[in-house]
């Protein structure tokens, strides 16, 4: 565990952001809705992949600590990378991953008091189902109401990939659902998936839940999900994940150029 603790102590994480955009275009442009924040550890010889790092941490009971650390670090870096953008077009929404069990911790309550960005600009993505069966529907409902009162929104990630995702959806009643990339990939070649997605998107629309198609990489995928009324899209077709340090440099350069224009 020393390697995980050391990574946190020395902030050995690269923070990236990826755009989430409106699927319906206005003037041939997909308007920006927000960003998902991704924190990738700078891997040494101990781990071969980011997934292995986080799996190792979870197996040693460090998911909650890592959640709090990476959310705080990511939001701080995101805030600092978007100061110029915020002054011009308002604060974009920022999506961060969190385990449900973390939301029931004292550490989360402490962070919530002093979030680096306004709570109304934060969307919490329940990215895994760890701890879901530990709590009653009543406990989860109370927690979701507390988050709503604080101004935060909730998304359920990887929806459509089995019972656990649908179980989470039924308990949480989220503001957003994120359609798993495996359902998005090459959907224009699969009539069965097309019919299923159309029915699900129509259902979520009736429930006033916004939908985000993840992992969009092709124009045909954009066209299909736009046609069936999906609210937002995310993926390499729109933007590859961008280090926030690079975003900061780009925004500062644009600001300097505008002053000299």
Residue positions per predicted region:
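Short loop/turn motifs at secondary-structure junctions
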Residues: 90, 118-120, 173, 229
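Distinct, well-ordered alpha-helical segments
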Residues: 79-82, 103-116, 133-143, 165-176
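Alpha-helical scaffolding segments of alpha/beta enzyme cores, especially the outer helices
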Residues: 107-114, 139-149, 199-202, 224-227
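EAL-family c-di-GMP phosphodiesterase catalytic domain
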Residues: 2-12, 18, 40-45, 126-133, ...
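Helix C-cap/helix->beta junction micro-motif
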Residues: 90, 118, 150, 206-207
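Bacterial c-di-GMP phosphodiesterase EAL domain
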Residues: 1-117
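Short, conserved glycine- and acidic-residue-centered signature motifs
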Residues: 67, 136, 140, 193
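Regulatory sensory/coupling modules that transmit signals to nucleotide-handling catalytic cores
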Residues: 110, 121, 258-261
């Amino acid at each position: 565990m020393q390697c995980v603790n050391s990574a946190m102590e020395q902030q050995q994480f690269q923070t990236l952001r990826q755009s989430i955009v409106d699927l319906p275009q206005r003037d041939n442009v997909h308007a920006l809705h927000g960003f998902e924040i991704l924190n990738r550890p700078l891997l040494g010889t101990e781990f071969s992949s980011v997934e292995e790092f986080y799996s190792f941490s979870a197996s040693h009971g460090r998911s909650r600590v890592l959640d709090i650390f990476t959310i705080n670090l990511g939001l701080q870096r995101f805030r600092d990378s978007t100061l110029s953008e915020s002054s011009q077009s308002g604060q974009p929404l920022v999506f961060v991953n969190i385990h449900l069990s973390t939301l029931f911790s004292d550490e989360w309550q402490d962070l919530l008091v002093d979030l680096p960005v306004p709570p109304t600009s934060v969307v919490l993505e329940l990215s895994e189902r760890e701890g879901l069966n530990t709590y009653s529907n009543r406990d989860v409902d109370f927690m979701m109401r507390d988050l709503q009162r604080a101004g935060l929104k909730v998304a359920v990630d990887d929806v459509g990939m089995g019972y656990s995702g649908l179980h989470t959806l039924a308990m949480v009643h989220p503001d957003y659902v994120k359609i798993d990339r495996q359902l998005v990939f090459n959907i224009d070649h699969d009539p069965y998936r097309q019919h299923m997605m159309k029915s699900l998107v129509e259902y979520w629309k009736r429930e006033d839940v916004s939908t985000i198609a993840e992992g969009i990489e092709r124009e045909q995928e954009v066209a299909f999900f736009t046609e069936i009324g999906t609210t937002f899209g995310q993926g390499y077709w729109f933007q590859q994940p961008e280090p926030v340090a690079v975003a900061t440099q780009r925004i500062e350069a644009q600001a300097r150029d505008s002053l000299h224009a």
